[in-house]
């Protein structure tokens, strides 16, 4: 009851791809969440089940549409990518559903829409809010997951395109949906795609259960100074997936392409078996997450508490661009001096100036 708003990471309905899905939206608003929306605003993230040819999702929420208006490659729907500040936290809501817009290739793991439009938008938001002590991204489809969607063919593309953006923007936490399972992943080093083990402490060892707690871990403090924590809070509905076994993850290497994938699951990882939700309390350099199961006619039952910690301030994005000129040259390729004396950092048909701003992108 003390929450300031409710974050919902997508899939409000099951049959959104059907043009006749309005009855599900009516049930969602009138029955499922009426007590919630009468007390607080909802921060929506569009899920793959919410997307429909009649754009029904966009008629139910009033979110900012500047991203679509300014994007070089336009997303399908209005208001699916937006940001806002609340307290010390910058929230960046975005969608991975449009990765195929513009030019993309699942073999080379490239998407001009994600790398350019979404990536540049992330950088603009971070640069515009240097006062933010925390940077939290919200998305439906997973960058990392260990359940029903671990094998999705587009997920490696999401990692290849989004991890450099998360690193560049020093994103602390990514709240995901899609997988209907409870998963604490990381903090992940964006370059090596491995957990930063010295950033994890106070994780309790508990009896392992093949469904409710695959890792046999509970609680923990996760320091995100040098990496990003990924969290999926299971589901508040009735559609549930079970966690994948370590052997399954190893066998699926050719699909997910991440070495020692199971090691990324550094906290509790399992299926609560009941509708669940998590509360987030921000207090200075600590975010406390309490996760609850819901039983009809009973008080919610706390089943896990963990803490996210940041002990170092973010680098202001403008300063970071100045400091990383040599790294940018190494990453993006050669340096060209223009006739007016300005310097560009160029790779193929894309160029940045020395502040890291995109100058042109002629890739199709």
Residue ranges and their predicted role:
Residues 1-46, 50-80, 116, 123-127, ...:
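Divalent metal-dependent phosphoesterase catalytic cores across multiple superfamilies
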Residues 317-364:
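C-terminal outer-membrane/trafficking sorting elements
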Residues 55-137, 142-148, 164, 169-173, ...:
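Metal-dependent phosphoesterase/phosphodiesterase active-site architecture
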Residues 11, 50, 95, 178, ...:
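Acidic active-site catalytic centers that drive phospho-/nucleotidyl reactions
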Residues 20, 128-131, 324, 363:
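Alpha-helix capping and helix-coil boundary motifs
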Residues 1, 129, 343-346:
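Alpha-helix C-terminal capping segments
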């Amino acid at each position: 009851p003390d929450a300031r708003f409710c974050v919902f990471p997508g899939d409000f309905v099951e049959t959104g791809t059907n043009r006749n899905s309005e009855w599900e939206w009516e049930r969602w608003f009138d029955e499922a969440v009426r007590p919630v929306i009468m007390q607080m605003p909802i921060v929506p993230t569009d899920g793959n089940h919410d997307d429909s040819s009649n754009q029904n999702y966009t008629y139910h929420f009033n979110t900012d549409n500047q991203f679509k208006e300014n994007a070089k490659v336009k997303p399908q729907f209005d208001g699916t990518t937006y940001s806002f500040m609340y307290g010390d936290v910058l929230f960046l809501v975005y969608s991975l559903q449009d990765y195929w817009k513009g030019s993309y290739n699942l073999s080379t793991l490239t998407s001009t829409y994600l790398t350019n439009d979404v990536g540049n938008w992330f950088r603009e938001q971070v640069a515009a809010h240097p006062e933010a002590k925390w940077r939290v991204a919200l998305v439906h489809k997973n960058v990392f997951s260990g359940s029903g969607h671990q094998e999705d063919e587009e997920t490696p593309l999401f990692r290849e395109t989004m991890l450099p953006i998360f690193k560049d923007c020093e994103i602390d936490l990514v709240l995901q949906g899609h997988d209907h399972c409870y998963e604490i992943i990381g903090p992940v080093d964006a370059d090596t795609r491995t957990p930063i083990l010295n950033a994890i402490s106070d994780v309790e060892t508990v009896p392992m259960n093949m469904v409710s707690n695959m890792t046999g871990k509970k609680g923990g403090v996760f320091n995100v100074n040098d990496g990003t924590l990924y969290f999926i809070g299971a589901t508040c509905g009735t559609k549930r997936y079970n966690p994948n076994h370590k052997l399954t993850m190893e066998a699926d290497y050719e699909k997910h392409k991440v070495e020692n994938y199971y090691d990324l699951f550094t906290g509790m990882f399992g299926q609560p078996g009941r509708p669940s939700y998590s509360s987030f309390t921000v207090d200075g350099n600590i975010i406390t997450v309490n996760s609850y199961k819901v039983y009809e006619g009973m008080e919610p039952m706390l089943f896990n508490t963990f803490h996210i910690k940041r002990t170092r301030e973010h680098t202001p994005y403008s300063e970071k661009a100045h400091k990383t000129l040599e790294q940018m040259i190494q990453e993006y390729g050669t340096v060209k001096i223009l006739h007016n004396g300005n310097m560009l950092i160029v790779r193929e048909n894309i160029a940045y100036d020395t502040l890291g701003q995109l100058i042109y992108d002629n890739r199709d």
